[in-house]
Amino acid sequence: MCLIEMQDVWKTYPNGTVALQGIDVHIKGGEFVYVVGPSGAGKSTFIKLMYREEKPTKGEIVINGSHISRLKERYIPHMRRKIGVVFQDFKLLPKLTIYENVAFAMEVIEASKKEIKPRVMEVLELVRLKHKARSLPDQLSGGEQQRVAIARAIVNNPDLIIADEPTGNLDPETSMDIMETLLDINKRGTTVIMATHNKEIVNNVRKRVIAIEAGRIARDEQKGEYGYED
């Protein structure tokens, strides 16, 4: 089943910069896809279009049967409930505990307290941080904070995880730990799309690679290589 379809997608910013042009992509449910390319090639725009942080200038984007490029603003929060996003800089709430950070994602969709506690503890166990539930973010390492961000992204059982440079601020060992967590989530059936500059991970853990150069798709390969010297 096709989870994501992009058909002739273009993005031009108000200053005239053409970030993406003529993008055609089909991603099946359950895939793990790397998005690679030089800095400024359009990777971030490509990723942001999928959760409607950006809107295409032209073209169609369909995710799980929903034409998100046509969605009215009031429907976007509901659409995003089916998508988990993991950022490079974690974006945790500093004054909330780890448990509270993850629970907040469920509170936003008005889940009951009866539902929240067992589910939050379940995902914290999945990312191996159940023992840190009462800790604050600044008491955790960078890798641990990113695992909390992943727990928050998956707590509402999304169909899709979008990870934008999730290992960008981490050392090689911690980066591989984060990668293993994302692979585990993918094995459970969740589609994962990961924008990255991490050559070692892409070349050592072979998955589908979509390479973007100058706003266009330059390569789309199964078990592809990174292909750049950063």
Regions found by a protein language model. Name each.
Residues 135-140, 144:
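Conserved ABC ATPase signature
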Residues 157:
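Conserved catalytic motifs of ABC-family nucleotide-binding domains
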Residues 96-104:
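Short coil-to-helix segment of the ABC ATPase nucleotide-binding domain corresponding to the Q-loop/switch region
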Residues 172-174:
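Helix N-cap at the start of a conserved alpha-helix in ABC-type nucleotide-binding domains
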Residues 51:
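Helix-to-loop junction immediately C-terminal to a conserved catalytic motif
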